[in-house]
Amino acid sequence: MASTASYSPSPTSQWRTQKLPKRFNFYVIHNQEFGKLSQSSSLPTSSFPKTLKLPVIQMPINNNIQSQTTVCVSTDENLEELVNLQKIANGVLTKESNKRVFIQDPPWVSSLFMNSLFVRAKQVQGVRREFREIERRRRYAMLRRRQIKAETEAWEQMVEEYRELEREMCEKKLAPNLPYVKKLLLGWFEPLRQAIEKEQNAETTVKHRAAFAPHIDSLPADKMAVIVMHKLMGLLMMGGKEERCVQVVQAAVQIGMAVENEVRIHNFLEKTKKLQKHMTGAQSQEDMSRETMILRKRVKSLIKRNRVVEVRKLMKSEEPESWGRDTQAKLGCRLLELLTETAYVQPPVDQSADTPPDIRPAFRHVFRIATRDPGKSIVKKYGVIECDPLVVAGVDRTVKQMMIPYVPMLVPPKKWRGYDKGGYLFLPSYLMRTHGSRRQQDAVRSVPTKQMQQVYEALDTLGSTKWRVNKRILSVVESIWAGGGNIAGLVDRKDVPIPELHSDDIMEVKKWKWRVRKSKKINQELHSQRCDTELKLSVARKLKDEEGFYYPHNLDFRGRAYPMHPHLNHLSSDLCRGILEFAEGRPLGKSGLRWLKIHLASLYAGGIEKLCYDARLAFVENHIDDILDSANNPLNGNRWWLNAEDPFQCLAACINLSEALKSSSPHTVFSHLPIHQDGSCNGLQHYAALGRDSMEAAAVNLVAGDKPADVYTEIALRVDHIIRGDSIKDPATDPNALLAKLLIDQVDRKLVKQTVMTSVYGVTYVGAREQIKRRLEEKGLIDDDRLLFTASCYAAKVTLAALGELFQAARGTMTWLGDCAKVIASENQPVRWTTPLGLPVVQPYFKTQRHVIRTSLQVLALQREGDTVEVRKQRTAFPPNFVHSLDGSHMMMTAVACRDAGLQFAGVHDSFWTHACDVDQMNRILREKFVELYSMPILEDLLESFQNSYPALTFPPLPKRGDFDLVEVLESPYFFN
């Protein structure tokens, strides 16, 4: 058989053919054979091309030919058309009886071939898409099973772990290799389990059990023991005002709640086990209800559940009434009492064999004196569970063994559909953090679903953002932490030394006691910070190998969104923000590379963040070598990144930029880094938009400018000017003169920033004083505590006065809001309003009522929401709460719009995040939504709602509004930057 040649038809060539029959096979011959064939055939020579170019496609000619002759026919550039194909076939086949005819590449044949190829490719692509979809569903189902197991079997797994450790200890003596905390918990587990089991089996009267240990037998003793130990240790790690202790009422209620939640799941599983066990042969699956089948499958294998929604409905329909805080506290107290009786620690010191070991209780129940009321002889006491210093030391070193509830989810959260419908698959999830305010709960529950739809969508959008752990940053953090911390903002892992007394002088002893108190307080704060860091790192370690995870969000009562997981989240510290990144990567693009550089400069801060964009870009270009060195050698190089205000986020940006700069095509490098766009003193931005004041709008970047306006620097300059003026006055006539001299050259942006930031949220004089005092302490230029206090008082007054001068319109709006709240609260009514997105808000400030209950441990005084409003709190809290509800609305509106535009979005109140390549689009959206929000008659609607709700009351008139045009916000490059 001859070889194949190629042919490219002339543009002018045309084919006219007859439809050819099927079932013909053709072969290709060489040019020489074709020439011989043409000479021996009856075909004219001009009918054949001068140069033979044969395609791969083969065509049949005639289905009634007996013999086979092969003839190759092609077009030539000088040939206009071929002779009729039937004539060719007849002529050839009469001369050569054993040959066939082969037809070469007409356009319609090529079209058929390409069309067939295209159809085939589409089929292959479709199959691939189907396989990808099948794989996606398979992986989702696997992750969903893991998530359900994590939510429902956590305590069960901990119990099994303790049992396994006990077996290994007996067989292999593994105790010396266990972490310290694990040793403690393992040592407490069996005695506590036995004590609980004994309590469960005790022949006590129903009345006695109801009074002191209700529901003590509602869970297996081993599971209850694990819950008590871990909840108490978790509370101790969270830290608080007290050193090495936690209040009994707090611990008891928390433990009672944890037991109740586990009881619901446990009872549900036990019930389905009994259903399965007592099924007779006659009771086939067909006879069972759909619900029973689901229950049985769930018990048989939690991992294989696929009907989570139906199961939750069944659980909810069969749930008993909530225990209530009284019952929770009673049970919690009894379990705490059993723990204090059975848990012991032994100091790790060498002791002689003939000396009994120094074993002492790990926990003690003691009473402490509350702050005495002046002029009253009654001393108030409260009970605490105090832990031994050895327990604190162990907790300080490691918390890897602690079980943390509400960890980030492996699958997207359930969409919100109601007050308690959404978030985690099985763990109790509530739309709003009401902190026990029944009025707020009732308000949210009573609102139609349609009215809340925008809020639900926003929370779903925030919860659908997929995150992952930045392993390179985590590795750097772990290295620093293992080395003792104390750099890059990490807390020092060593306590400050307690000063020793070297004199018997009364004054020296007094000073020594004060220094000891101060050192202990510092160490207490360090301990709390170390526990917090360990909690964050423990979650990061657990999630570092996951492809991605999600944060279910809910709201505070004002409508601000928060992740439900409290430790490792993007609302937290620089440590958390540096460790977290988007799971999805997107190419930087030209604009993304620019924004990455701007982002890096802003994170470095030190005043760089207040420069124009071009200056920030120039800063990065001038430090390229430092950036590359930081990325390549973060701990052993020149460590430039450590000088940044947000060091870990800065390092993450250095690494991302380094990857781009090393690439031959920087714009195509994928980036997972969230790029921030932050509001400029966002509370004042909202007040400026409400009041339409042009001067205030310019001060907070609602108006376009060549560089960002810095309101903090502006206030600092005003404060410095006032202080310098006071410093030249006569101290005999003006007592502030000496304080002013003391503060010269100490006033800067940092000194006043927090006070300015919180002024719009209703900061009081006392609050401002404490904020400024902390900044002055950090400077360390005033040693005397009394002098530091008086200087802080003076600086706070001056700062608030400067604020009042610059933001008069904002003060007017704040005053109007406060006056309206006072009118309402004077009628013993809480202030209520509805946010622009339809969320009802009720201020939860009521005088509390004390409710005393007797427990086995002590008498507890539980506080409940009363019926009398706190007038002062209702008035002072309303302005900041109202503005918070507005900034929450702006963030949620932006989140939904970004989702609709295909952007990944994360929000931190007044800081919006997305991929570098999408920053320009997000900037446009957030400005449009701000203008849309404040184009609504917000204050007018608020006043109308007050008048409709309280027609008998008289409210002050609306504050005057300025002439600022909101449209200018759309053109302001530094509104968010």
UniProtKB/Swiss-Prot annotation:
<dbReference type="GO" id="GO:0034245">
    <property type="term" value="C:mitochondrial DNA-directed RNA polymerase complex"/>
</dbReference>
<dbReference type="Pfam" id="PF00940">
    <property type="entry name" value="RNA_pol"/>
</dbReference>
<feature type="active site">
    <location>
        <position position="678"/>
    </location>
</feature>
<comment type="function">
    <text>DNA-dependent RNA polymerase catalyzes the transcription of DNA into RNA using the four ribonucleoside triphosphates as substrates.</text>
</comment>
<keyword id="KW-0804">Transcription</keyword>
<dbReference type="InterPro" id="IPR024075">
    <property type="entry name" value="DNA-dir_RNA_pol_helix_hairp_sf"/>
</dbReference>
<feature type="active site">
    <location>
        <position position="753"/>
    </location>
</feature>
<dbReference type="Pfam" id="PF14700">
    <property type="entry name" value="RPOL_N"/>
</dbReference>
<feature type="active site">
    <location>
        <position position="910"/>
    </location>
</feature>
<dbReference type="InterPro" id="IPR002092">
    <property type="entry name" value="DNA-dir_Rpol_phage-type"/>
</dbReference>
<keyword id="KW-0548">Nucleotidyltransferase</keyword>
<dbReference type="GO" id="GO:0009536">
    <property type="term" value="C:plastid"/>
</dbReference>
<protein>
    <recommendedName>
        <fullName>DNA-directed RNA polymerase 3, chloroplastic</fullName>
        <ecNumber>2.7.7.6</ecNumber>
    </recommendedName>
</protein>
<dbReference type="InterPro" id="IPR046950">
    <property type="entry name" value="DNA-dir_Rpol_C_phage-type"/>
</dbReference>
<dbReference type="InterPro" id="IPR029262">
    <property type="entry name" value="RPOL_N"/>
</dbReference>
<keyword id="KW-0150">Chloroplast</keyword>
<keyword id="KW-0934">Plastid</keyword>
<dbReference type="InterPro" id="IPR037159">
    <property type="entry name" value="RNA_POL_N_sf"/>
</dbReference>
<keyword id="KW-0808">Transferase</keyword>
<dbReference type="GO" id="GO:0009507">
    <property type="term" value="C:chloroplast"/>
</dbReference>
<comment type="similarity">
    <text>Belongs to the phage and mitochondrial RNA polymerase family.</text>
</comment>
<keyword id="KW-0809">Transit peptide</keyword>
<dbReference type="GO" id="GO:0003899">
    <property type="term" value="F:DNA-directed RNA polymerase activity"/>
</dbReference>
<keyword id="KW-0240">DNA-directed RNA polymerase</keyword>
<feature type="transit peptide" description="Chloroplast">
    <location>
        <begin position="1"/>
        <end position="72"/>
    </location>
</feature>
<dbReference type="InterPro" id="IPR043502">
    <property type="entry name" value="DNA/RNA_pol_sf"/>
</dbReference>
<dbReference type="GO" id="GO:0006390">
    <property type="term" value="P:mitochondrial transcription"/>
</dbReference>
<dbReference type="GO" id="GO:0003677">
    <property type="term" value="F:DNA binding"/>
</dbReference>
